[in-house]
A protein has these predicted regions:
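N-terminal targeting leaders of membrane proteins
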Residues: 26-121, 207-252, 643-658
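N-terminal cap/lid segment of alpha/beta-hydrolase-fold proteins
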Residues: 253-301
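Short, surface-exposed "cap/lid" segments of acyl-processing enzymes
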Residues: 297-344
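Alpha/beta-hydrolase active-site loop
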Residues: 355-380
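Alpha/beta-hydrolase-fold enzymes
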Residues: 405-527
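Short beta-strand/loop motif that positions the catalytic acidic residue
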Residues: 583-585
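Conserved alpha/beta-hydrolase "acid-adjacent" motif
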Residues: 590-596
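Catalytic histidine-centered segment of alpha/beta-hydrolase-like enzymes
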Residues: 614-625
Length: 658
């Protein structure tokens, strides 16, 4: 977790010496792998296909780094967070955002100096122009008109200068409070600090550090809660940011459903403190014998209650979940969210099967959990909910439709009925969706082998360049179709790693060979990074289901039957008969084939709504889309029968799917 990247010399020296003294605590665990080269069982073609290697980072000090990251987490959670809450309450969000811009403007001397030392003349000129514009027109940096003029930040520091001069790779280092670093960057932080004007006025230096820590602590802690292991992606992203140095790349964009899908990054809450205002509670899940957490936002007066289920790997406090919760809350509804069955939290605490991926079971587990949540909220706040609406996004939308399709059977089990079922950008075929994600991840195979590494670095370079500035909804993201495919596939491949490790921590099938300890995880991540989604389904899920689900055998026929049962066509009858099912999707969503769209229109008729563009989730941040969805949902809710609105809940409902 990184709360601030600027350093104070004395504390940096002390912490650096401390960490170097602990450097003997190195990891000795090796990555081991199962040999699939001679495998001829179901799905063998996926195990023998060429794959792009997942970005890996050497971390010889991992045990020490993880221990220090744990100290940092405790400090942030129990010291910084309470103080920061007071600061954020007193200082409005708009003011804090402008203070951040002012603090950033003060970094100009170090930035321009390091651009010059690296012979980046154009970048130094652009940084100087930014500083002049923002200092004058922008009122000492309180505003950022330079970005609107096309002058983007060019942040460089002495660590990057040392890299440019030849010190390319350096041992990763985590320093409490100061965050991810390396030996090279730690040394570079000393001249960095002296190049920062605030250093020479202690109140300014302390104020800047306090502001940045207070402003970022909730987001940082949320990353720890949302991810199965926040340390791993933070280390990889930091190292890529420090090592990828691409000055020239093609600023090109293809207009396609895939590139439009990248606009899903804009699906985040407008109020950055919205997540911090969530109430969190737990319900008991019989299948696991554990408590499952849920988050909710309650209206002061009686209102509809919206149940949210996020997409693949999604957590109840993830950015897209919070965005949808905020939209529903601002529209007058109370909102409750649970994590997706493919997220570590649900795998550990809410799943009847240890391995997610079998949609009928996953959807049933969600329904059981929501039934428990509904009963809990109704008991705490009687008379506060005028109706109940289930909304799912992406894979959560597929689960929502399975719940809707099995509504009559669920009622016999005492599971909560809903007045409206809203599916946002669902897949119809799980198999098609997983194949698409695997294909996207391997999109760079289209590059010639000798230039593949450079091309991938260029893609990372674009991402890192854009991350330095303001990203506003509506701006064009400069990625080609192939580049967008790779970025989407890469993001979901990391979710797969979390999924595999979380499921194997609960029930080890013996597929993985690498030992894991509390402070050494990197070797295991290297092993699981070599599995695709289709390999996961055939190496983990299929053998597991064959011993637990009637009709599933561990062969090609069993694999085919599994995917058929995970297809929406398996619940076609229930969907046709349920007038309260709504689907909102885009015609150019990569998860939907032409025959899938035709099938949805045939089954749902006017209840299936398709927008002409937006890709997968790429237009859900747009208020015009919100208005269309809200109008249709309200109209459907008004026509809901009383049995759904006032349905009773059996607290002893079974927790296993039929």
């Amino acid at each position: 977790m990184m709360l601030s990247r600027r350093r104070v010399p004395s504390s940096k020296r002390a912490l650096l010496l401390f960490v170097l003294a602990l450097s003997s605590a190195c990891s000795t665990i090796e990555t081991k792998r199962r040999d699939w080269s001679k495998y001829t069982g179901p799905g063998a073609q996926y195990f023998h296909a060429e794959e792009i290697p997942f970005p890996q980072v050497d971390d010889p000090l991992e045990p020490t780094n993880r221990a220090l990251a744990g100290m940092d987490l405790a400090l942030a959670r129990y010291v910084i967070r309470p103080v920061a809450a007071v600061y954020r309450f007193v200082v409005p969000q708009d003011v804090r955002e402008h203070l951040t811009k002012t603090a950033d403007n003060l970094l100009y001397p170090g930035r321009v100096l390091n651009n010059l030392l690296q012979a980046k003349w154009s970048a130094a000129g652009e940084e100087t122009a930014r500083f002049c514009v923002n200092t004058t027109v922008g009122a000492l940096g309180f505003f950022d008109p330079a970005t609107d003029m096309g002058l983007h930040p060019r942040p460089e520091d002495f660590g990057q200068t040392f890299a440019k001069w030849g010190w390319k790779r350096s041992t990763y280092l985590f320093v409490p409070i100061l965050g991810p670093s390396s030996i090279r960057d730690a040394l570079g932080a000393i001249p960095d600090t002296y190049a920062e004007p605030a250093t020479y006025y202690l109140p300014a230096a302390l104020g800047r550090r306090f502001h940045l820590a207070s402003n970022g602590v909730e987001a940082a802690l949320r990353q720890v809660e949302v991810n199965y292991d926040a340390y791993e992606p933070a280390r990889t992203l930091f190292t890529l940011n420090r090592e990828v140095d691409v000055e020239d790349f093609s600023w090109a964009r293809d207009e396609s459903g895939v590139t439009q899908s990248l606009d899903a990054i804009f699906l985040e809450p407008e109020d950055r403190d919205f997540g911090a205002r969530a109430h969190t509670d737990t319900v008991w899940i019989e299948a696991t014998g554990r408590e499952l957490s849920f988050s909710y936002w309650l209206q002061a007066e009686p209102a509809p209650l919206v149940f949210l289920v996020p997409g693949l790997g999604g957590h109840r406090l993830g950015a897209s979940t919070l965005a949808l919760a905020e939209i529903a809350f601002l529209n007058g509804s109370s909102v409750v969210a649970v994590s997706n069955p493919t997220n570590w939290e649900f795998i550990e605490n809410g799943a009847s099967l240890s391995l997610p991926g079998y949609v009928p079971s996953d959807a049933h587990d969600v329904h059981v959990a929501l039934t428990r949540v509904n009963r809990r909220l109704v008991s705490l706040y009687p008379g506060r909910f005028t109706s109940k609406r289930l909304t799912g996004i992406s894979l959560g939308a597929l689960h929502t439709l399975f719940i809707a399709g099995n509504e009559r059977l669920a009622e016999t089990e005492g599971l909560v009925p809903f007045d409206v079922y809203v599916a946002l950008d669902p897949a119809v075929s799980l198999e098609h969706g997983l194949l698409a994600l695997d294909r996207f991840y391997n999109a760079p195979l289209a590059f010639a082998p000798q230039e593949r590494a450079r091309k991938i670095d260029e893609i990372f370079g674009k991402v890192l360049y854009l991350s330095q500035g303001e990203l506003d909804p509506g701006m064009e993201l400069p990625f080609t179709k192939l580049e967008a495919e790779f970025l989407i596939g890469l993001a979901y491949r990391l979710d797969l790693q979390f999924l595999i490790l979380a499921s194997q921590a609960r029930h080890d099938l013996g597929v993985l060979r690498t030992r894991r300890t509390l402070l050494t995880q990197a070797p295991a991540f290297r092993e699981v990074s070599e599995y695709s989604y289709m390999e996961y389904m055939h190496a983990f899920v299929l053998p597991y289901l064959s011993t637990r689900v009637p009709g599933i055998t561990c062969d090609e026929a069993g694999a085919r039957r599994t995917f058929e049962r995970c297809d929406l066509r398996a619940v076609e009858g229930g969907l046709r008969a349920n007038p309260r099912v709504l689907v909102f999707a885009n015609e150019n969503d990569f998860l939907l084939r032409a025959e899938d769209i035709t099938w949805l229109r045939d089954v749902l008729g006017a209840r299936a709504h398709f927008f002409p563009a937006g890709g997968h989730l790429g237009n859900l941040h747009r208020k015009t889309i919100h208005a269309v969805i809200d109008a249709v949902v309200e109209s459907t809710d008004e026509r809901a029968p009383d049995h759904a609105r006032n349905g009773s809940v059996d607290p002893d409902a079974p927790t296993q799917p039929p």
